[in-house]
């Protein structure tokens, strides 16, 4: 049975959404990918949507929406995106904080950099799960 991984931050509109999308690409054979937050936004960050579509061919407007922690199933692994003091708590067997800067309001270059970091971290995470390290 695949592990369930949740990528979490406060608003579930940018980094956690990017991570969910990339988890569905690079971890799909190894884990189920979810994202959530303690608050939702009416729409996902449109810069994040555009960058993920340009880089990976995935339209997050079609495949995802902003969700609350209570909207997702019980998970095995919680990945915090890096929300400092106000990061949401989600019960899980394993919790990590990736400490990513929020690119909201910054240049496309920052969004691309964030996406590439998330991609590498997800590939790493998938390998650890595959090797039964998590």
Task: List where the protein language model places each region.
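Short polar/charged helix/loop
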Residues: 2-134
């Amino acid at each position: 049975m695949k592990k369930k991984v949740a990528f979490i931050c406060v608003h579930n509109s940018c980094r956690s959404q990017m991570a969910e999308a990339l988890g569905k690409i690079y971890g799909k054979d190894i884990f189920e990918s979810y994202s959530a937050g303690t608050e939702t936004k009416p729409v996902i960050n449109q810069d994040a949507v555009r960058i993920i579509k340009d880089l990976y061919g995935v339209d997050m407007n079609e495949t995802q929406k902003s969700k609350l922690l209570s909207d997702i199933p019980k998970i095995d692994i919680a990945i915090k995106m890096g929300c400092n003091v106000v990061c949401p708590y989600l019960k899980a067997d394993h919790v990590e904080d990736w400490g990513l800067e929020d690119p909201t309001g910054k240049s496309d270059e920052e969004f691309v950099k964030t996406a590439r970091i998330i991609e590498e971290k997800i590939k790493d995470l998938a390998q650890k799960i595959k090797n039964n390290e998590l």
